[in-house]
Amino acid sequence: MDVRDAVEADAGRLAELTGAPTDVMRNLVHDRTVRVAFERRGSEGDHEAGGESEGDDSDDEHILGFVSFDAKRETVHITQMEGTDAATRRLLEEPRRFAANEGMSVELLVASGNEAHRSVAETVGFDEEGPGPRFGGTPTVRYRLDP
């Protein structure tokens, strides 16, 4: 599995992962830092896990997941995360690394019923901080990782 910056051409696959319109995901790529985890088709195992890529051969790639984030004040806010458990675990390293380099905390809101994302957050070291805001009536749980 490799990780690279998302590009506009990824919007269709990101829309498939989220159920959101392609235009919304295209705007996400423009407005936030978005990283995608992918595997090259037909070459599984040819690349070391966690590698970096320039992403110049997107037709030969299968996107497994993505994470979007932005930084405000002293906190990196993870705004969206979708994908396989392995991909989301790997992708959470991206905002964590950025935050560590900048001496910032990381915050993640997860829908309270999304056990897969809650488990991934806890597995990679986030601490549950209590309830977060509601989005569209859905309660969330706030997770935080301090430097």
Describe the residue ranges of each PLM region.
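Conserved beta-strand in the GNAT
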Residues: 45, 55-71, 77
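A short, internal acetyl-CoA/4′-phosphopantetheine-binding micro-motif in the GNAT/acyltransferase core
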Residues: 73, 78-87
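Active-site rim helix/loop that mediates acceptor-substrate recognition in acyltransferases
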Residues: 16-58
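Conserved active-site alpha-helix within GNAT-family acetyltransferase domains
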Residues: 112-131
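A short beta-loop-alpha structural element at the N-terminal edge
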Residues: 2-14
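Conserved GNAT acetyl-CoA-binding A-motif
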Residues: 99-112
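Conserved catalytic-core motifs of GNAT/GCN5-like acyltransferases
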Residues: 109, 127-142
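Conserved acetyl-CoA-binding loop-helix of GNAT-fold acetyltransferases
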Residues: 83-100, 119, 123
